[in-house]
Amino acid sequence: MNFPYADRPMWLYSRSSDKHLRVLFQQMQNLLDEAERREYTVAGTSQDMGSGKSMARMGLKQMMRAVKGGLAQAVLVQNLTRLSHDPAILMKILEFLQDHNAVLITTESDLQYELYIKGLEKHFLRRASQKGLRLPW
């Protein structure tokens, strides 16, 4: 089976606010397993333990540096909430990915549907049209 973006170097990112480390480790292991199943080239990984209420997260910053530096052209996460539950933070992260021609891939949800439900899909469609950018999915 051919998966989209298999030709792009992939960054795997996980985040959990659960106090048990095993939850975070299991989430990353699931991403690694899924990346292998889809035959993605993993350029790197990062994790954050704690809330997604801020952009000031070491693992998130590592991922963004990798994208900005061209090391990764796609980011694999379990679902959109692993980036943040806050729509304003989600928009900043997705705009960053869009500005750097990178895409976000979710393993356990339909990203476009999640964005639609959160009322964010139209923003990125409009932004892509106005700025001549690709969609970040």
Whereabouts are the PLM-identified features?
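Short, structured surface patches at the beginning of a domain
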Residues: 1-137
